[in-house]
Curated annotation (Swiss-Prot):
UniProt modification remark: Specific enzymatic cleavages at paired basic residues yield the different active peptides.
Pfam families hit by this protein: Orexin
Protein family (similarity comment): Belongs to the orexin family.
Propeptide feature: residues: 98-131
Chain positions found as Pyrrolidone carboxylic acid: Q34
InterPro entries membership: Orexin
GO cellular component: extracellular region; neuronal dense core vesicle lumen; perinuclear region of cytoplasm; postsynapse; rough endoplasmic reticulum; synaptic vesicle
Domain of life where this protein originates: Eukaryota
Methionine amide sites (modified residues): M97
Name of the protein in its database record: Hypocretin neuropeptide precursor
One Gene Ontology MF term: type 1 orexin receptor binding
Length: 131
C-alpha cells in the first residue's frame, strides 16, 4: 500500500514554526516586564503606540483601528493623511493639494531686461518669451 506523497512548502513550515515559537517568546518574563519609558511616565511625549501595545484594554481593536481614525494632526500633515486614507484617486488628490489651499501661485520673477507686466504674462511654459 503506497501512501500519497505530500510536499510541504517552506513557507508553510516557516509559518508553523513562527506560530509555535513566537507566542512563548512574547510571553517570556523579559518581554512582559519592560519598564515604562520616562517620557511616557511623565507625559512629556506622545506614547499612543506604546500605550496600545503595553497598556490595559483591547490591543487588537486599538491597533486595527489606528489607521482608520479621523482625528489627524492639523495642517498640511492632517490633510495629507486624510487624502491617503480616503477612497478615490490619491495621486490626483496629492498633486492638487497645494492648489486647494486657497493661495494663489506666486508670480514668476522676470529675468529679462525688457520685462514689463504685459510681457511677463506672455511667457511660454518653456520659459521663452512670446514677444
Amino acid at each position: 500500500m503506497n501512501l500519497p506523497s505530500t510536499k510541504v512548502s517552506w513557507a508553510a513550515v516557516t509559518l508553523l514554526l513562527l506560530l509555535l515559537l513566537l507566542p512563548p517568546a512574547l510571553l517570556s518574563s523579559g518581554a512582559a516586564a519592560q519598564p515604562l519609558p520616562d517620557c511616557c511616565r511623565q507625559k512629556t511625549c506622545s506614547c499612543r503606540l506604546y500605550e496600545l501595545l503595553h497598556g490595559a484594554g483591547n490591543h487588537a481593536a486599538g491597533i486595527l483601528t489606528l489607521g482608520k481614525r479621523r482625528s489627524g494632526p492639523p495642517g498640511l500633515q492632517g490633510r495629507l493623511q486624510r487624502l491617503l486614507q480616503a477612497s478615490g484617486n490619491h495621486a490626483a488628490g496629492i498633486l492638487t493639494m497645494g492648489r486647494r489651499a486657497g493661495a494663489e501661485p506666486a508670480p514668476r520673477p522676470c529675468l529679462g531686461r525688457r520685462c514689463s507686466a504685459p510681457a511677463a504674462a506672455s511667457v511660454a511654459p518653456g520659459g521663452q518669451s512670446g514677444i
